[in-house]
Amino acid sequence: MKPLHLKLNNFGPFLKEEIDFSKIDNNELFLISGKTGSGKTMIFDAMTYALFGKASTEQREENDLRSHFADGKQPMSVTFEFQLNHRIYKVHRQGPYIKEGNTTKTNAKFDVFEMVDGKYEIRESKVISGTQFIIELLGVNADQFRQLFILPQGEFKRFLISNSREKQGILRTLFDSEKFEAIREILKEEVKKEKAQIENRYQQIDLLWQEIESFDDDNIKGLLGVATQQIDKLIENIPLLQARSKEILASVNESKETAIKEFEIIEKKTLENNILKDNINQLNKNKIDFVQLKEQQPEIEGIEAKLKLLQDITNLLNYIENREKIETKIANSKKDISKTNNKILNLDCDKRNIDKEKKMLEENGDLIESKISFIDKTRVLFNDINKYQQSYLNIERLRTEGEQLGDELNDLIKGLETVEDSIGNNESDYEKIIELNNTITNINNEINIIKENEKAKAELDKLLGSKQELENQINEETSILKNLEIKLDRYDKTKLDLNDKESFISEIKSAVNIGDQCPICGNEIQDLGHHIDFDSIAKRQNEIKEIEANIHAIKSNIAVHNSEIKFVNEKISNINIKTQSDFSLEVLNKRLLENENALNNQRDLNKFIEQMKEEKDNLTLQIHNKQLRLNKNESELKLCRDLITEFETLSKYNNITNFEVDYKKYVQDVNQHQELSKEIEDKLMQLSQRKLIEQNNLNHYENQLETYNNDLELNEQSIEMEMSRLNLTDDNDIDEIIAWRGEQEELEQKRDTYKKRYHEFEMEIARLESLTKDKELLDSDKLKDEYELKKGKMNTLIDEYSAVHYQCQNNINKTQSIVSHINYLNQELKDQQEIFQLAEIVGGKNNKNLTLENFVLIYYLDQIIAQANLRLATMSDNRYQLIRREAVSHGLSGLEIDVFDLHSNKSRHISSLSGGETFQSSLALALGLSEIVQQQSGGISLESIFIDEGFGTLDQETLETALDTLLNLKSTGRMVGIISHVSELKNRIPLVLEVKSDQYQSSTRFKRN
């Protein structure tokens, strides 16, 4: 991610400010400089806020970012443009605020744009989704962004000096290692659940074992006495338990079957005796009822005689009924014949009236034909009547418009001639403008060279003066140094090494005597007197130390002056006095003014000519358009004339309205005539068809009447023959028999019921006699008592068997469940053993007492330290290396960092480093952290890094090394920005972003040293 442009409104001390990072060439190192409180860090806050809605430091809240001097009606907003993977994006974030005069807060806004084909297209327009889009785009969240892109105040060395728990929190955020802690918790819960399930399964086994029925059997009680924790013993006893239960069930079943057989015997005997008793009673009752039924025999015989006579007279009755129907049909046919004759007469009358109407209509035929001819000839005119009507309406307008267009065209042609006369032979001369611009540029360059040379000469004189002054100081100090060295050489340095040996010599003297052998030199001791003046030796030694101290101080001063002379010489060598023009500044300025005036005059002339050409082109275009409109007008006018001529020729009318009225009237008359003619023809056709239908109906009715008369004659003959057969003389005999027909159904039912019951009694008496023949009836009370006794015994044994069978089956189910639980328990213990071991290892119960998360974080920390040591070795002149403290305890340590001093070959606490050494280590670790996070985050594009940390703790050499390190970052393609107050950085870093404050608001500008 590389910043391109930053725009701030009411943000911190910036009311309205823009920073153009595109002025930074080739990712060069640049310095952000300004007084304390001017708003340097706010630049970092703005970038972080624009992307994530947060400041670059955690301590600053969003409400703290709004300027105190902002207009109450204006929002705080940041617009940030940046480049990522060769694509350009822009984000605009507006903070929430309460607008002056309102009581409710105006919500925050956030828009994300991407440049496509030179234009920004919106990608997101909501705060939450937009921020998530940026996180996914950059591949980092706000915390990771602070570690990768911006190293803010107070957090620069936080990672270096933090303890394991604090580092764990930082590394968790950067490497998303909480998932490993989540795995540990999941495994812990899983183990807890599994152990609970295992314990629950033991309880279920115990509960099932206790619920097994013993049937009060000593063998089963002995088997059930085993403890349920002895699952192997349970498996061994279960088959024995099931076998004994089956034996008990078989014994009960045998007693039950015996009782059932005894009950079935007495039940069968009781049932047979009850059936015999019922049959005897039924037989006696049926015999009595059968005698009573036979008493109805004479009545039934009379009914049968009546029914026979009714059956014989049926044919005669049918003939009589048929005679009545035929007589009715004859009467109806006569009525139909009369009605049909009347209808035919009416139809003949209607036809005569319609014939008269037809004759009257045919008398107007010639007039109608002439109207039809007119309609056919002018139909095409009427269908397009609007076209002809419009021609009459437009012809005058088109004549007037044509005359007006002709006049306007003539005026435009005259105007074009005037413009062409103004242009004449003049042409735009842009080459002359380029030539004058080049001349002006050259003159400006010569003027700048003269000014720069004057400034360089003044700087050179100043540096030469400083150099001469330093050389004079060195000469003076060199002379003093020589005198001190001569004085030092003149001192007697003998016996100086005995100055601190006085006590040692006294001890030796007290331990030896004259004549003894000296323990030092081995010679015989001749004298024990004082041969050495220790006071004189101490005095000479102090004087020598003082001279040596002065010599060392003077040498240090000379070295400092030599370093300063070297620095001055470097500055002198960097001063470049360029070759300049022989002309004076006054002459060059005069020439510059002349050329600028000539340039302005030529620009005015070119502008005038271009305006005239533009006006000429405009007039030419207008003339062309007018000519087109005039041509169009003439074409439309000709078309109108042709249409009017066509209309008047075909219609013989010169008025559209009159033509329309007459045409519509003719069409109406023709349509009415044709409709009336068709209506008359339709009526005649209908009358003809109706008369034909009625004539057919009349013939049909007459034929029917003849048929009915013949049928009536034949039916009368049949009646006479049937009465003769039945010996009936008149209609009274027939009426008496007909009266019986109302009772026929009742008589038939009574006869049939008698015959049916008679047959049923015969059958039932025969059946019951066969069932009771040769059978003896037993005592019912005795049978009932014996039946109840056997039934009670059987039910008791059935209930006992059901209970024992259920308990046996229940025992089998429970033992099967126990076996299933035991098998599952054994398999579960086997399967979960690896999970238990894994949970212990992940939870820190291992040889290093490390949780899985800390193991992963240690791996990442080792990589970070290895990357950091590559730079720290250079910055510390191969003295220091960062190392991870190996001590671990219950997974909460192992992330502390110590420093290894290669000079002493020992490691020590990080707090033992000086301020400058701490800065070196912090910078190296921060850069290493940045690179490792980039690698682990899918190759985040780190094209820039900003450091907000003081460099004041560094000495000259360390500062140079730190700058070299940051310059190396530039060579890897990163833009590097630094906030610092160190004056040396202002001299070393050529590009400075100055932040100035007037106590009200701040402003920025880029400048080069």
Swiss-Prot record:
The answer to whether UniProt assigns keyword ATP-binding to this entry is yes
One GO biological process term: DNA recombination
- Coiled coil start-end: 176-364, 392-502, 535-802
Lineage top rank: taxon: Bacteria
Which InterPro entries does its entry note?
P-loop_NTPase (IPR027417), Rad50/SbcC_AAA (IPR038729), SbcCD_Nuclease_C (IPR053380)
Q: Which Gene3D superfamilies match?
A: P-loop containing nucleotide triphosphate hydrolases
Tell me the residue numbers annotated for binding ATP.
Answer: G34, K35, T36, G37, S38, G39, K40, T41
Annotated GO MF terms = ATP binding; ATP hydrolysis activity; endonuclease activity; exonuclease activity
Q: Which UniProt key words apply to this protein?
A: ATP-binding, Coiled coil, DNA recombination, DNA replication, Endonuclease, Exonuclease, Hydrolase, Nuclease, Nucleotide-binding
**UniProt-listed Pfam families:** AAA_23, SbcC_Walker_B
- Keyword Coiled coil present in the record's keywords: the answer is yes
Residue intervals passing through the bilayer: none
Q: What does this protein do?
A: SbcCD cleaves DNA hairpin structures. These structures can inhibit DNA replication and are intermediates in certain DNA recombination reactions. The complex acts as a 3'->5' double strand exonuclease that can open hairpins. It also has a 5' single-strand endonuclease activity.
Give the similarity note. Answer: Belongs to the SMC family. SbcC subfamily.
UniProt subunit comment: Heterodimer of SbcC and SbcD.
Name of protein: Nuclease SbcCD subunit C
